[in-house]
């Protein structure tokens, strides 16, 4: 439920609750919160159990498409191609990866980058010398 709240945030919330409620009312507030969360969880599990009882085997029929949607949500493009176009056989993709050369193969082992000539550095201007003006650029 609180999967994206870290220990630092929990400590800040605890200190804020201590300041706002005070040490006298804090234990009662914690008890009320835990009791409410347990009751909410019981309501949710009771509703799920009641839905299973009323729908019977149809409940499983409802869960199958939802499970398939969840499975598709987590798939990568490669996984989708493998599953639907290649019937789960990804040997074709592995063979294709072996056949296509990588950048390191094309340019040797020097970090995959070709050797480009370094740009020429112009000497600095003399004290009274003006920089060249490009009339086409202005």
Curated annotation (Swiss-Prot):
Chief location category: membrane
Membrane topology: Single-pass membrane protein
Biological process (GO), any one: protein transport by the Tat complex
Region entry Disordered, spans: 104-138
Gene3D superfamilies: 1.20.5.3310
Keywords: Cell membrane, Membrane, Protein transport, Translocation, Transmembrane, Transmembrane helix, Transport
TM stretches of this protein: 2-22
Compartment(s) of residence: Cell membrane
Basic and acidic residues: compositionally biased ranges: 117-138
Subunit structure: The Tat system comprises two distinct complexes: a TatABC complex, containing multiple copies of TatA, TatB and TatC subunits, and a separate TatA complex, containing only TatA subunits. Substrates initially bind to the TatABC complex, which probably triggers association of the separate TatA complex to form the active translocon.
Family: Belongs to the TatB family.
Function: Part of the twin-arginine translocation (Tat) system that transports large folded proteins containing a characteristic twin-arginine motif in their signal peptide across membranes. Together with TatC, TatB is part of a receptor directly interacting with Tat signal peptides. TatB may form an oligomeric binding site that transiently accommodates folded Tat precursor proteins before their translocation.
Protein name: Sec-independent protein translocase protein TatB
Gene that this polypeptide is encoded by: tatB
């Amino acid at each position: 439920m609180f999967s994206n709240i870290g220990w630092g945030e929990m400590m800040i919330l605890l200190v804020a609750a201590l300041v706002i409620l005070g040490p006298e009312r804090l234990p009662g507030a914690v008890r009320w919160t835990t009791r409410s969360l347990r009751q909410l969880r019981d309501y949710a599990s009771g509703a799920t159990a009641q839905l299973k009882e009323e729908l019977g085997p149809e409940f499983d029929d409802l869960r199958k498409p939802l499970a398939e949607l969840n499975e598709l949500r987590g798939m990568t493009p490669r996984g989708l191609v493998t599953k639907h176009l290649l019937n789960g056989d990804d040997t074709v993709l592995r063979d294709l990866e072996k056949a296509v050369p990588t950048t390191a193969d094309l340019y040797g082992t020097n970090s995959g980058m070709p050797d480009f000539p370094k740009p020429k550095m112009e000497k600095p201007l003399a004290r009274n010398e003006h920089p060249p003006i490009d009339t086409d650029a202005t």
